């Protein structure tokens, strides 16, 4: 079985994330969306809230599961669940520069490969941080987030 991990904080999930997860589901038998919980970071949504929003959004995608990932190494999480690959979306060259050293270390530690999927052009400018900022200032982000996330941002889970 070919299992891949799509890791991230997903705070919040946006349509760029969903598009990468859906493409990964077409490439692998199973995709685990690993929701990170780094105690050094401050999140808008709890892990449980993020998981619920992701599950509501990807429920129609065959072979996709959502799991929390603790503060440990991603490579170790992959080893524990038997993942063959890590899937990362890339919005541009800066993302690759950031991701490449981590991919090399993950491969060194456990042999897990990182597969990069270029972002859909509609979402190359979208990030979770930008979504939170624009929404917080009263901007309309409905075009960029799934319905479950928009409800969460508007105060109703």
Curated annotation (Swiss-Prot):
Q: Where is this site: Transition state stabilizer?
A: 17
What are the subcellular locations of this protein?
Cytoplasm
Task: Mark the transmembrane ranges.
Answer: none
Substrates-to-products reaction catalysed: (R)-4'-phosphopantetheine + ATP + H(+) = 3'-dephospho-CoA + diphosphate
Pathway listed for it is: Cofactor biosynthesis; coenzyme A biosynthesis; CoA from (R)-pantothenate: step 4/5
Position of the signal peptide:
none
Whether Ubl conjugation counts among this entry's keywords is: no
Q: From the Swiss-Prot or TrEMBL record, give the protein name.
A: Phosphopantetheine adenylyltransferase
Highest taxon in the source lineage: Bacteria
Give GO BP annotations, semicolon-separated.
coenzyme A biosynthetic process
Tell me, in one coarse class, where this protein mainly resides: cytoplasm
Q: Which co-factors does it depend on?
A: Mg(2+)
What's one GO MF term for it?
Answer: ATP binding
Q: Show the CDD domains listed in the entry.
A: PPAT (cd02163)
Q: Which UniProt keywords apply?
A: ATP-binding, Coenzyme A biosynthesis, Cytoplasm, Magnesium, Nucleotide-binding, Nucleotidyltransferase, Transferase
Q: What is its EC number?
A: 2.7.7.3
Q: Which residues bind substrate?
A: 9, 41, 74, 88
Looking up NCBIfam families in the UniProt record yields: coaD_prev_kdtB, cyt_tran_rel
Q: What is annotated about its quaternary structure and interactions?
A: Homohexamer.
**UniProt binding sites for ATP:** 9-10, 17, 89-91, 99, 123-129
